[in-house]
Amino acid sequence: MWAQLLLGMLALSPAIAEELPNYLVTLPARLNFPSVQKVCLDLSPGYSDVKFTVTLETKDKTQKLLEYSGLKKRHLHCISFLVPPPAGGTEEVATIRVSGVGNNISFEEKKKVLIQRQGNGTFVQTDKPLYTPGQQVYFRIVTMDSNFVPVNDKYSMVELQDPNSNRIAQWLEVVPEQGIVDLSFQLAPEAMLGTYTVAVAEGKTFGTFSVEEYVLPKFKVEVVEPKELSTVQESFLVKICCRYTYGKPMLGAVQVSVCQKANTYWYREVEREQLPDKCRNLSGQTDKTGCFSAPVDMATFDLIGYAYSHQINIVATVVEEGTGVEANATQNIYISPQMGSMTFEDTSNFYHPNFPFSGKIRVRGHDDSFLKNHLVFLVIYGTNGTFNQTLVTDNNGLAPFTLETSGWNGTDVSLEGKFQMEDLVYNPEQVPRYYQNAYLHLRPFYSTTRSFLGIHRLNGPLKCGQPQEVLVDYYIDPADASPDQEISFSYYLIGKGSLVMEGQKHLNSKKKGLKASFSLSLTFTSRLAPDPSLVIYAIFPSGGVVADKIQFSVEMCFDNQVSLGFSPSQQLPGAEVELQLQAAPGSLCALRAVDESVLLLRPDRELSNRSVYGMFPFWYGHYPYQVAEYDQCPVSGPWDFPQPLIDPMPQGHSSQRSIIWRPSFSEGTDLFSFFRDVGLKILSNAKIKKPVDCSHRSPEYSTAMGAGGGHPEAFESSTPLHQAEDSQVRQYFPETWLWDLFPIGNSGKEAVHVTVPDAITEWKAMSFCTSQSRGFGLSPTVGLTAFKPFFVDLTLPYSVVRGESFRLTATIFNYLKDCIRVQTDLAKSHEYQLESWADSQTSSCLCADDAKTHHWNITAVKLGHINFTISTKILDSNEPCGGQKGFVPQKGRSDTLIKPVLVKPEGVLVEKTHSSLLCPKGKVASESVSLELPVDIVPDSTKAYVTVLGDIMGTALQNLDGLVQMPSGCGEQNMVLFAPIIYVLQYLEKAGLLTEEIRSRAVGFLEIGYQKELMYKHSNGSYSAFGERDGNGNTWLTAFVTKCFGQAQKFIFIDPKNIQDALKWMAGNQLPSGCYANVGNLLHTAMKGGVDDEVSLTAYVTAALLEMGKDVDDPMVSQGLRCLKNSATSTTNLYTQALLAYIFSLAGEMDIRNILLKQLDQQAIISGESIYWSQKPTPSSNASPWSEPAAVDVELTAYALLAQLTKPSLTQKEIAKATSIVAWLAKQHNAYGGFSSTQDTVVALQALAKYATTAYMPSEEINLVVKSTENFQRTFNIQSVNRLVFQQDTLPNVPGMYTLEASGQGCVYVQTVLRYNILPPTNMKTFSLSVEIGKARCEQPTSPRSLTLTIHTSYVGSRSSSNMAIVEVKMLSGFSPMEGTNQLLLQQPLVKKVEFGTDTLNIYLDELIKNTQTYTFTISQSVLVTNLKPATIKVYDYYLPDEQATIQYSDPCE
């Protein structure tokens, strides 16, 4: 290399530049607060008598960073400083100023830097990613700064939210222990299923976990091959492997589907048929290694066309031999048309003119393997023409090259590595096969010298904490320095935008000669990882500059190095093992060890180095935009404005070779750009920057580089098993084994003896540690295998229904080297029944590495968790086994296993809610609640609980997305998820309770609701229940949507055109009388029938216009009021009277309002301290303590309340009256904060929010005592700080009498919820309902089967038809609808939509009429369950859910 360099230098003509003293000041462009940063001053000898000052000027003060006088030799001086806080709190643009005074010199220079408050990172770690109801949740919270040092600041609040966003627990003023918060929470046995959230720092940081009903998998299925595919291949091997969690291979049946899916867009046109997927199905058995392999011909698939997806979907299902338990694995593999690829390696994006440019080209085949002895055509594109070189790769697929640059004339040059010189022929009808060539664009490095500096690259990722030698080559031109002059090479090591390390190498050119090398020893730490940069430069006495820059790849490491291990790494269940922990002295270590089975269910939730680094998304390229430095060109042109820092990509670019147009700033080819690229500001009078070239630039080519991946290392322990005592009983099966905090002493080591749980599995353990001096550290995950060579295992479902039979499977495993004879016993119990207790004992012969399965048909007779005890032992028998007497080991001859199953009650769940609003006002306010049960209750199925909130809107606030427990698949039902959020937000905003967390969550729901509602919009601007599927838009729903969109504009973006289009459509349907015509199906029941139909509809539309902010003078409003005045005082319909009273209150027509309110008062029902209205009053003798209101009664009472509250000011008498109405409405709440249907929920929540804003007195401090006559007592404390916390406790005595006693100041909202199961009722007053089940094949009761259901239903009530109706079909255990059911049902009469949830099929009907409607579909059995209990079919009126009919259906084979 040096010979070529010297040949290049002989061509240069010497020219000695005038010796000018120079300086160079560097510091980070982004100064994070709080942090310690460095500023460096590099001075030449010419400044020996000059005093330099560097200052940082902010809005608040001027801070002197450095004051220094030059020396007689070149010297680099750096000093650390504390970054001041930014003015304004978040960020501030400050000025860095350097000045020099002395020796007849006076100058100064300044630049901008950004001071930015750095955010901390917080993570939440749970002991497991998912839980079952009733389990304990453990979680930790850690906050650290960007240097991974733990922060010990107090958390003002940590809250836990359930899937409905109920705040079910909170912890206030939480103080970490050495940066770690360790908390726990007990889930209720009836805990809601779904995703729970741990919210920290006012909701800015979240951790989540799931609550599900699951059974831990015992084995893992993996698609081992293929990992990648290419169109070049003729075939590929599919390999599926399955192993138990303790590492042994599993035997079972394998089904593999290898499919190429058809592209949906390809057959979207109506005239095209849907293309079938191209599939190959494979089946077989796993071998002794637990694997199954089979070849697949690539000719099966479409490799060149566009009609099919260019990826293969592999779905593998493995069924365990003997148990029938199955597990799945899915893999999508891209079929690459790429036949090979080339990449440049060990190259820069610039070259030094007249010095040889060297690099390498890596060549890979279609499978990413290195291609050896392969031709490479290197093409050089320059201003002087195009030149070619032919290279050959070595055994590593590398082709090195060296190019002479003297002929490039200091211009841009592009290099391309090609597989072949001829271009491939492109066929637009086919996916082209191609070679990925290598591209590299080179710019000349700007320098006024003929000297050279080059840094050798290091292959990464590099290890932290280990010294790395970096070799630097240089050549010094004689013109740049005389032989007796000392040359100083300055270097900076930059990580995460901070100057971490700096130094100088002083060399004497006389001693070193023209060319030489030196090395730097660098040690990388977490402050530098993962992508540090090194900049080296020299400024010669002549003024010339040489420089080079390199970026390293460093592992994501931490300064606190943590390791964890078990000794031995394999141990018997129930035996002791030593846990060995190592970390920095004084660390506090948080340990976690969980069953690998849990991680198989959720493998992506683990804490890792990458996830911790990901909390600090460090910014590397260029300067922050606030302090960017652009080159300004004097001429106007396409770049005559400040340019962005990111390269804009023109549309229609090719993904293989993309053209990037650059703005006019220097591009990485001078010392200035080196510093800019690593985020350092530089102030200097040296020639460090290339002059600006404002001429038009040619497009350049950009190439992306890929990164390789590693393979996990296999580890096997040869440590012998320690023997535990014989006849072990295994019944301790935690999913989390270890969850503890361990302090580390001065030795940096800790050893703890722990007992291995009873599960045969692998335990995955990890630990993180915190230290104030060494920061955060995270250990690799290690495993401990709990294993014994002879054991029994039980296969159980998560839950069963009492009375249903299920199959209990026991599998005995023999991993001894000999055959054994075993006896297996299932213990008797009164909690379950066996078909024949004589079959509870079995014996069999079991040879090495074999397994034997035994089955029993079990019927559970007791609710709750019941235990199954299975015992197996090795018999000392003379009966031959494997051709000889069975082997009997000295120890480990028996194994006993105890495992539970949850038994659930049969029947239909009924939920009753009693709500109470207690306002003690200085004296005790009390109420009695009687938990009474019906006679037809399912035995032992009762549960009851009480919930307490300090705010009347609290339950609704916590359940914004679940106010009504009904399907929500049409345009109006979607609005019940939308409208109440607006009212809740309005209330919270006025009450000063609207936190950023609540706003963020609520706005998210609004944005989703807005998007969904637009699906139901017609092209004319109107809306209907099912959108364009309906013939016309609907007047009522359009008014409802328009009102809500108008009110939501304050919180989210609503396109004004959507509102204007709807208003225009409604205006077109306003009659000359001012009334509104009923267009489309009128969904709302209360507006149907008789003369009041037009009046109530007009009232609703006019109210909607007024509520969205329209003035009474608006033509649509004024004409609507004119229509309503004609019948305002003459209407006798109670609902219409309440609605009109509200309308005229909004319009300010107080005379008419008062007349209507008097009419309402005459029909008000007063019950104790409550006031309400009902269209069908119920005699008081039949009054129920439970919430069972008619939806229309809730709605008209809510309108009456809105009318009472809508006036400029309220008297105390009016507030008292409103409170009495609220007392009744509050009692009608369901357990989720809503009411029975949609419109009653919307209007009632609107009224309650208005009351809460106007007249409600929230709790200051209240003690609520809940007690029973059976000596149960629980006290709840409610204050302003926990006003919105959802407090709950179980009520143990059912049936029973409970008393609620509230004392203190304010109001408290209490709900008592009673849940029990009953056998389905057969009431047919409003709907007829029957079902026929087609003939089923019952010959093979152990095989899955299909059932055809034919449902007959009609409306038999007092009206001509029902409102929208839902047919709700519950699935039999183990059954689900066959594929295509949705499309089949949508073709049947009146069906508007079909939805399938976990175990329920909902069929939406436009209405039901007197004529019987018939619906037929098929359900198929996917899980075999015997002795099936019946399932239910229910039909109900969506808007009058009390109108319903329910029947049962059964499997005819049972």
From Swiss-Prot:
Subcellular location(s) of the protein: Secreted
Region of interest (Bait region), residue spans: 695-726
Molecular-function annotations in GO: peptidase inhibitor activity; serine-type endopeptidase inhibitor activity
Record field: transmembrane: none
One Pfam family per UniProt: MG2
Main location: secreted
Tissue expression: In the epidermis, expressed predominantly in the granular layer at the apical edge of keratinocytes (at protein level). Also detected in placenta, testis and thymus but not in epithelia of kidney, lung, small intestine or colon.
GO CC terms in record: extracellular exosome; extracellular space
Single GO BP term: regulation of endopeptidase activity
InterPro entries: A-macroglobulin_rcpt-bd (IPR009048), A-macroglobulin_rcpt-bd_sf (IPR036595), A2M/Complement_sys (IPR050473), A2M_N_BRD (IPR011625), A2M_TED (IPR041813), Alpha-macroglob_thiol-ester_cl (IPR047565), Alpha-macroglobulin_TED (IPR011626), Ig-like_fold (IPR013783)
Glycosylation (residues): N120, N281, N409, N857, N1020
Cross-link Isoglutamyl cysteine thioester (Cys-Gln) per UniProt, renumbered positions: C970-Q973
Subunit: Monomer.
Similarity comment: family membership: Belongs to the protease inhibitor I39 (alpha-2-macroglobulin) family.
Functional description taken from the UniProt entry: Is able to inhibit all four classes of proteinases by a unique 'trapping' mechanism. This protein has a peptide stretch, called the 'bait region' which contains specific cleavage sites for different proteinases. When a proteinase cleaves the bait region, a conformational change is induced in the protein which traps the proteinase. The entrapped enzyme remains active against low molecular weight substrates (activity against high molecular weight substrates is greatly reduced).
Disease note: Otitis media: An inflammation of the middle ear resulting in earache, fever, hearing disturbance, and vertigo.
Name of this chain's protein: Alpha-2-macroglobulin-like protein 1
Gene, per the UniProt record: A2ML1
